[in-house]
């Protein structure tokens, strides 16, 4: 907070690409890995315990209201299973997603960032604004234009802010800003 991080902190890694989770095993004094996926008992047990503890910690520090459990570009079925685990741990957790638009899970997402080229239905965007939910768009390595690659015309970066304003969105996200083709 003292360094200006006071609006939102996104906490990732519930659904990593490899679905492999590293932990420290005190009994063997070594690092171990567990492979488990949303919908599996081990996944739920592990994450409910962690998120319950994390929720308590965030509340003690006064950070809970600015933290969101975040995911990116996962299939809707995976996100639905993950949302159930998050809600079981603490129904008040905010959830953030950068990915495709899915009407089925949209109401559960505090911060929803969809890929450029997709649109929020106007009534959804207006409702989200009334509910003080963040509604954004993003670009990543998929689309060559517009973007912010080293080969991109600088005007593209300026255009993206105008696009966000024209669509009445809360902002723009350059996903994986350090990942270039």
Label for each model-derived stretch:
Residues 111-180:
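Catalytic-core region of carbohydrate-active enzymes that cleave or remodel glycosidic bonds
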Residues 1-93, 98-106, 178-180:
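Aromatic-lined carbohydrate-binding surfaces of glycoside hydrolases
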């Amino acid at each position: 907070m003292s360094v200006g991080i006071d609006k939102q902190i996104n906490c990732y890694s519930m659904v990593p690409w490899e679905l492999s989770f590293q932990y420290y095993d005190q009994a063997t004094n070594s690092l171990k890995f567990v492979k488990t996926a949303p919908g599996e008992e081990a996944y739920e047990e592990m994450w409910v315990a962690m998120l319950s503890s994390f929720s308590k910690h965030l509340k003690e520090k006064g950070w809970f209201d600015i933290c969101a459990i975040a995911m990116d570009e996962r299939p809707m079925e995976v996100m639905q299973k993950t949302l159930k685990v998050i809600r079981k741990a603490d129904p008040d957790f905010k959830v953030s997603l950068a990915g495709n638009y899915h009407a089925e899970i949209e109401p559960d997402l505090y911060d929803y960032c969809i890929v450029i080229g997709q649109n929020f239905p106007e009534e959804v965007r207006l409702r989200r604004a009334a509910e003080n939910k963040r509604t954004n768009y993003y670009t990543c390595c998929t689309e060559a234009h517009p973007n912010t690659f080293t080969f991109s015309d600088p005007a593209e970066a300026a255009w993206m802010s105008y696009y966000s304003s024209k669509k009445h969105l809360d902002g723009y996200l350059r996903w994986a800003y350090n990942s270039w083709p």
